[in-house]
Amino acid sequence: MGNDKTNMFVAIGLSLLVLLGWQYFVAGPRMEQQRQIEAQNKAAQQQPPGVTPDGVPSPSPKEGGPAAPAPGTLPTAQGGPVSREAALARSPRVRIETPALSGSIALKGGRVDDVSLKNYHETIDPKSPEIVLFSPAGTETPYYAEFGWVGANAGPLPTNDTLWTSDGKTLSPGMPVTLTWDNGAGLVFKRIIAVDDKYMFTIRDEVENKGSGAITLYPYSLVSRWGKPHTQGYYVLHEGMIGYLGNDGLQEFTYDKLAKEGAYGGANTKGKAWTGVTGGFVGITDKYWAAAAIPDQDTPYTGAFTDRTDGATNVYQASVRGDAVNLAAGASATATQRLFAGAKEVNVINNYEKDLGIKHFDLMIDWGWFFFITKPMFRALDFFYHLFGNFGVSILVVTFCLKLLFLPIANRSYVSMAKMKAVQPEMAAIRERYKDDRMKQQQATMELYKKEKINPVAGCWPVLIQIPVFFALYKVLFITIEMRHAPFFGWIRDLAAPDPTSIVNLFGLLPFPAPDFVHLGVWPIIMGITMFVQMKMNPAPPDPVQAQIFTFMPIVFTFMLGSFPAGLVIYWAWNNTLSVIQQYVIMRRNGVKVELWDNLRSTFRRGNGTKAAATKS
């Protein structure tokens, strides 16, 4: 095979390694730095409106409204954090029971502060604890949603210490509950809470002014999280504050980025607000779970992200505050908002966007810049999953379909490679004839390519096509909850996690765990073997250095993919296998000898010769 072709293959392999490293070590940090610079520049040009000490945007002076009191404060737990059970026992509660959720609403404060996901567990063991999303104040990591009204001239308003009464003991789909509180000064508050069979709460706050004077109130809702959680994104997906704020579009702030924002409102508080927003949502997102405050999609509001330092703890908050509601004596007002608290299931998120009209709610799932590849990839995998009932089988079928889709391109590539093999004797003669003149050798080679209608870089297309598919599948496996704990066959019980076996302990035969830094399971080894076989379908490069690179490349990729999700490794091994079969058929059809076995024999013969030489010396 000619030097041009071998050089190109070497470049492709090394480029893939460089691309992976560049994405992780350079592109991610550079993008984060650029976002911070843009945020700082924009903050310098715009003075944000005031906020309460807890991050709920208070009316700015230009609105002519009063300063707002401080909702959302957390009572300090005497003696430090307490157990979850002890914290839950501090308040009477309304139980939450749905097909997807369990938990409770605290009547003291009227918060949704106890939510567990019934269909998701911490590990692949179905008996392991359920995922806990919300936890009440007083625990080690409080995380809750709060709703209500703020205002300065309205007298006592509901706070986190307000004890509400409830007309029911259990909140379930089709069975809402109504919370009531009378402030004793002419205002009666009602909160009607409903929930569907998935993860959406609907909260309707009503207030009736039985007093003699007019008042002005502002409805608000917020999601508050105490303490910085462990993030898993590694620049592959966003975790932290997220929102779609009307014309300002998608806004994403990592926890570290939010801490670098300018001072915002109250003491020890940093953050950013957007005023005059219509449509969208604000919230806090993890890899698989999220909580979002969703205002009425047709009513203007102010959205904000804040980071308040409370001693040694950071309090992260995403909040919305509606415009002023002027309430005359004898009048009443209603504010309806929603709360999403649950798993980021693709179809559920999309249905909420469509059925409830939540603008761009699908952005809650981070499909990345190449969403136009990632989304169709997930759709295809999901379609075949519902057909076969196994995401691993779905990966195999989608890979096969992609092979069929790109069959014309691959055929042209392999036909060109077959022709190139057929002219190997002529190319060898050219190298011998012009061995002292590199330029003439290249000119004669290109004339031969032109005469035989050979494209010297045609063999690159199968590899180039595989790269975007590889990254799209990696993204899908990493971000979508549907892939979490999705089993294959045998020992693969989670396609989104690395192969749990390891060659270090002989795949579990030896009684000790394998170290993480040498994680090399069965499937990465299978992938390495298929890659080795695929490379041996072609003759070895004449350059000894290039031949060594080609020999060690499968080994490098085997170790590199050892810590990658098993689903990705299975895809690569299956794709290599299909490529070998396809190349074999095309070569035989074009009358070209398949040199696989000859190349394998020569490889091991060289290895034995090297050992023999070393022994003699």
From Swiss-Prot:
The keyword Ribonucleoprotein does not apply. It holds the Pfam family 60KD_IMP. Its main location: membrane. GO terms for cellular component: plasma membrane. Belongs to the OXA1/ALB3/YidC family. Type 1 subfamily. Required for the insertion and/or proper folding and/or complex formation of integral membrane proteins into the membrane. Involved in integration of membrane proteins that insert both dependently and independently of the Sec translocase complex, as well as at least some lipoproteins. Aids folding of multispanning membrane proteins. HAMAP family: YidC_type1. This is Membrane protein insertase YidC.
